[in-house]
């Protein structure tokens, strides 16, 4: 970054923001890069600001029992805040004084006041000076307040992040990750730009008092009639706002449903294509879209009328103020013009500025209180360690994850001791206490000496990870003692990679030792992987190590733990993603040899690991089931297998294990509906979601999907609703900002169940930060991100004498920005927090505008209505001229004095009724036209949005995977959420606003040109200057916004990265380093945002300066060229003020339109995506008929002669596959053939291309070569026909939000009887019957109420219903319990006995049933032989299989044609043989 010119800028340069000219000039000429951005001033650095606020907050904590964050902020920022507030007040006072001088100028042309004619020129100079002073006061004040708000946000950003790193794990389990992001985004955004409106809470009342005093001087008591009307108007608009919220509430659920389905479709687009569900998904989403649009139109109409009422209230404010006085005393023209000017300022203060200021304070104080509560949360407490001890001891340890259970436990235990039963059965205590809450660990005891290896085993949810957390101090025990030295190293179950190089991830801040580093690299089998990278171990890894395979990430995490020189190493299932050979080698070389002299605790379920452990601890439901050596364990083998492997009965697994204790969240998102009653705190806390048994817990704005959260961008709105706090809006040009906009907006995604069309369970686990820390993005689970946008409230036309601050305030109510929703993307935040710069130009092209307005055929009607708008505005102006020019009446007190000039109008009591009827008639006509004239345009543009959404959805569903693979899932979802929301809500009214403003300016200029042609000459260069200035600024501002958007991503990426690795951070003591990285990310964003604010203020000030110059010219031309008669001068000066304020607003509005049209450009880019190819070969005959008669089996009654495929024979010739067109080949020259009904197993190391081959079979990749099924080539039929030949059980399970029936049969082809029959076959009947509604039960959040095994059974049922002849299985047993795994094996043998099966699997016993094996290595086929040949050779399969399994295969060695029998024996049936529960 470059050094900022601000450091050397003069006072004048700072006052006029001239120091920004170099960046504006550079941005206009070329594309800006990050290196072009200026460094931030030292006063804005996150280090300085956070240190300052943290010091004051610590002082507050130390000095008071009830510390207040507002006091710490006051001591840091109050005086500067008030300093700029005084400037703002003085600027507003000048606006209130301007009508006085205008009235004096008009009065100086009264023939009765000729003595004042000589001072008219001085009055004009004074009026112009007021405009100049206002400009010099307002702009620095607004910028200063923005600057203070930015500093407050930065300081609190840092304070919250530091606190997050200190929070206890118990607290983290209560806080949603989205709540943390909400703290760092929408709550803090209230300070950034909304701070400029905060002062109006005291400025507006003073201004109203001043204005009412001035109007009283003119009109006496009738002045309060206008004020009363404004108050009634404010209440009326509040009523319309509530009506609008009602529609938005209804609409929010529909938007939520649509985005849930859309998100699931995008995240599982490969599965959608594999199942041929494109049409079903499109129909489902479009149906939801139709209902949503009905409510969108209603909300838009109410919002439109609300805005129209505000604009056209100007007629009635003046009318009600002037009429009573005119009826009683009569009124002169000077008073009319002066009253109009006063009423415009008064209306803005009463109906806009004061309500916004109150709302800003309400929201800001609410946000401060939330942050204050968060900063007082319980912190992580380090245990007191004995640095001299060499052993690890745990005595009688009991622990709870639920906060407060420890105290409750002690009390309950004491009561139990006081009421001991006669038989002294202590177990009764635990069974009774489980009614209140279940401890995650119960009475755990063990002792291991230095250098020993303790293996911890147990079923899912048994408390293995919790045991390690107790040792680390992350989980504070309720009772018992822990003893160890405190020098700990930790390897998490789910690998955590921080952004940085491989070396930085392994060293992790520890001093570098070359020999130790090389030894660790070798022991963890990383040498070969590192050698493949050009940068070796200096290659930079992205967030989460997204460029690495799961096995590579796991080995790097293990290497990090091993590299640290510690006394105790805690290894939480570190081998989960490794193939069997790599696992064996690492366990031997690393755990057993390299760490032989260290104390190790290894969580594992592998028998070979238990055999080599010095001590074994088996946990079951939190209790110590066994502790001892392996030889002692063998005596308990019959019962031991169920505790170690979780092989309980199916009913128990499905009913109880899914609803176990709280720590089951360490494995997956679970259901609490039928769990034991949980204890909850009675006091409601800001960041704790509690619930009672039988009640549904509150969910975050975005419902979690399968325990994987994604960031979301939500278009923000104002009124607090369902826990969504209101934000202050921002200039619309800043899209995807940290500072969201809002006014009278909506909560798009309320905390409701996303699907409400069927019964749902009563309770549901909420996703917490703890879940984020304990889940991996590589589990193949559904991920979800849901976004949407709100609507805005628009003033349809500006008022005369609007200042830039008025316009700014109105913009705060009109444009809607983006906030980060309460649920977070933990996989790839960049895709959600900014859109790729792509090829979209900085300024929207004319081609985009033309294409947009020609989408709908009703454009001609829109153009006609635009003409009506123009005619209405001109007619209004002409009526005013007619009233002023053709009513030569006399005053009561001057009836004998005639007027020589027709413009010197005096309204008397005799003529007042006549004028009254004319005025009311004109007002009613314009009001009616104003209420309805914009509706056709709004209606048409919403229809355009509907059409574009349909086209984009169809395009995405039909796009090839090679194209979709180049796009980020978050980027695609943003098109359907953020951009469609803009097209629905913002763009129609913004376009109408701009068209109306432009026509108002044209009409006013026409009137002025009639009255004074010289002014028209001055207007033309001003308009040209505005257009040129806009074009000059727009080029740079759009680029700065993009850079700011990109700079926002690392902040939230770093937050989630830190949370995911928080246990590792604490174990290694790396919190200060990560705080420094967070500050760097903040400073990067600040540099972009501060520069954008500065250039925006430069632009607004230049517009104001042009207006001042124009007004000076108009004032002196009017004064010097006008003869006697006050009417002409009043009209000219009033219209001149209206022209320039309107033109100023029109320029800003045009920038808004350009920004919004970028969303249209992005939508068009998706619509123009290529579609999947059609058959490239001519239709070939098939059997005795034509291929056109060939049918895919979709019905069991199809005649055998017509079905295809009939046998399932596959022939693959020279198959080459690529993920993207022009990319590297993932598979090269693959050739083999499969006989009908044969079972083929795919073998290969992690990343060898097994899953890729299955995708290539489905034509999901860019492929070359040929595949034939039963003689039919894939080039000769459509993709739909080809893919329906396959049944698929993918690695990534796809359960969309909908009923069981919809998930099994989205096309509604099968009857209930047939579905129940298949459900019975695959073991799903007992699962489905548990739920209310059975097949009509609505699954939400990716089927969160189902275990992973049940989801796999759903996929299996889909394949059975498809009656496909070829079945593709991609690691179906991954993360399955043994019971569900056995069900899948049984179903495969029964339902697919005559089908061709291609299996990619890690479990040895599953592969033993295959007759042929395809070994893939280095993207090519290395071997394709029967199991007998592979066993005779030194193949990968022979290395992986155990001798015991080879013995089982001997009976089949001589008959390769026979189908192998399943050779799986339960663990309890094996005595001395080694159990191979490992992966290939």
UniProtKB/Swiss-Prot annotation:
Result of altering residue 549 to I: In CF; impaired maturation of glycan chains
Pfam families: ABC_membrane (PF00664), ABC_tran (PF00005), CFTR_R (PF14396)
Residue location of crosslink Glycyl lysine isopeptide (Lys-Gly) (interchain with G-Cter in ubiquitin): 688
GO cellular component: apical plasma membrane; cell surface; chloride channel complex; clathrin-coated endocytic vesicle membrane; cytoplasm; cytosol; early endosome; early endosome membrane
InterPro entries: AAA+_ATPase, ABC1_TM_dom, ABC1_TM_sf, ABC_transporter-like_ATP-bd, ABC_transporter-like_CS, ABC_transporter_C-like, CFTR/ABCC7, CFTR1_ATP-bd_dom1
Domain annotation ABC transmembrane type-1: ranges: 81-365, 859-1155
Name used for this protein in its record: Cystic fibrosis transmembrane conductance regulator
Lipid sites, type S-palmitoyl cysteine: 524, 1395
Consequence of substituting residue 225 to R: In CF; uncertain significance
Associated pathology: Cystic fibrosis: A common generalized disorder of the exocrine glands which impairs clearance of secretions in a variety of organs. It is characterized by the triad of chronic bronchopulmonary disease (with recurrent respiratory infections), pancreatic insufficiency (which leads to malabsorption and growth retardation) and elevated sweat electrolytes. It is the most common genetic disease in Caucasians, with a prevalence of about 1 in 2'000 live births. Inheritance is autosomal recessive.
Effect in UniProt of substituting residue 633 to P: In CF; impaired maturation of glycan chains
Gene transcribed to yield this protein: CFTR
Effect of residue 1069 to R: In CBAVD; uncertain significance
CDD domains listed in its UniProt record: ABC_6TM_CFTR_D1 (cd18594), ABC_6TM_CFTR_D2 (cd18600), ABCC_CFTR1 (cd03291), ABCC_CFTR2 (cd03289)
Isomerase found in the keyword field: yes
UniProt effect for mutating residue 792 to G: In CBAVD; no effect on glycan maturation but decreased channel activity
Transmembrane segments: 78-98, 123-146, 196-216, 223-243, 299-319, 340-358, 859-879, 919-939, 991-1011, 1014-1034, 1096-1116, 1131-1151
Phosphoserine PTM sites in chain numbering: 549, 660, 670, 686, 700, 712, 737, 753, 768, 790, 795, 813, 1444, 1456
Effect of mutating residue 170 to H: In CBAVD; uncertain significance
Matching Gene3D superfamilies: ABC transporter type 1, transmembrane domain, P-loop containing nucleotide triphosphate hydrolases
Cytoplasmic topological domain: 1-77, 147-195, 244-298, 359-858, 940-990, 1035-1095, 1152-1480
Subunit structure: Monomer; does not require oligomerization for channel activity. May form oligomers in the membrane. Interacts with SLC26A3, SLC26A6 and SHANK2. Interacts with NHERF1 and MYO6. Interacts (via C-terminus) with GOPC (via PDZ domain); this promotes CFTR internalization and thereby decreases channel activity. Interacts with SLC4A7 through NHERF1. Found in a complex with MYO5B and RAB11A. Interacts with ANO1. Interacts with SLC26A8. Interacts with AHCYL1; the interaction increases CFTR activity. Interacts with CSE1L.
Motif (PDZ-binding): 1478-1480
